[in-house]
């Protein structure tokens, strides 16, 4: 019974953390690849994320030898370069 309570509390904690911190996505550039930040700073990623209409961003390392820009408060459609560009420039919508 105690194991079940511990598992339940851990599950609730994970849900609460995801609600507080929200989802984050890595944006795609015009070549359909992620923005790498191996030699860049968090400020570079923050600017990239603002271009994708996100609230902010930073450089994260999701795997060994890989550093990607990760955006907070970004819509899935805006994670793609041309999707965000079309929202900013309505004349591009052909």
From Swiss-Prot:
GO terms classed as biological process = cholesterol biosynthetic process
- Site note Important for blocking potassium channels, residues: 44, 47
A Gene Ontology MF term for this entry? sodium channel inhibitor activity
Protein's name in the database: HMG-CoA reductase inhibitor bumarsin
Q: InterPro entries attached here?
A: LCN-type_CS_alpha_beta_dom, Scorpion_toxin-like_sf, Scorpion_toxinL/defensin
Regarding tissue, the record states: Expressed by the venom gland.
Q: Where is the signal peptide?
A: 1-22
Task: Tell whether Signal is among the UniProt keywords.
Answer: yes
Q: Which residues form a coiled coil?
A: none
State its role: The homodimer inhibits HMG-CoA reductase (HMGCR) (32% of inhibition produced by 0.6 uM), a glycoprotein involved in the control of cholesterol biosynthesis. The inhibitory effects of bumarsin are seen at much lower concentrations (0.6 uM) than that for statins such as atorvastatin (5 mM) and simvastatin (10 uM). In addition to inhibition of HMG-CoA reductase, this protein lowers cholesterol levels by inducing steroid hormone synthesis via StAR, and by increasing reverse cholesterol transport mediated by the induction of ABCA1 and APOA1.
What is stated about domains? Has the structural arrangement of an alpha-helix connected to antiparallel beta-sheets by disulfide bonds (CS-alpha/beta).
Instruction: Report the residue ranges that make up the LCN-type CS-alpha/beta domain in this protein.
Output: 23-90
Q: What family classification does the UniProt entry report for this protein? A: Belongs to the long (3 C-C) scorpion toxin superfamily.
Tell me where it resides: Secreted
Quaternary structure, from the entry: Homodimer; disulfide-linked or monomer (edited version) or heterodimer of an alpha chain (AC Q6WJF5) and this beta chain (non-edited version).
Mind listing the UniProt keywords for this protein, alphabetically?
A: Cholesterol biosynthesis, Cholesterol metabolism, Disulfide bond, G-protein coupled receptor impairing toxin, Ion channel impairing toxin, Lipid biosynthesis, Lipid metabolism, Neurotoxin, Potassium channel impairing toxin, Secreted, Signal, Steroid biosynthesis, Steroid metabolism, Sterol biosynthesis, Sterol metabolism, Toxin, Voltage-gated potassium channel impairing toxin, Voltage-gated sodium channel impairing toxin
- CC terms in the record's Gene Ontology section: extracellular region
State the disulfide connectivity: 37-59, 45-69, 49-71
Q: Which Pfam families match?
A: Toxin_3
Q: What is its main location?
A: secreted
């Amino acid at each position: 019974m105690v194991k079940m309570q511990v598992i339940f509390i851990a599950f609730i904690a994970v849900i609460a953390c995801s609600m507080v911190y929200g989802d984050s996505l890595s944006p795609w550039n015009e070549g359909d690849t992620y923005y790498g930040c191996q030699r860049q700073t968090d400020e570079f990623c923050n600017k990239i994320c603002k271009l994708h209409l996100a609230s902010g961003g930073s450089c994260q390392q999701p795997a060994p030898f890989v550093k990607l820009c990760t955006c907070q408060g970004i819509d899935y459609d805006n994670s793609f370069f041309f999707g965000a560009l079309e929202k900013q420039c309505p004349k591009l919508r052909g």
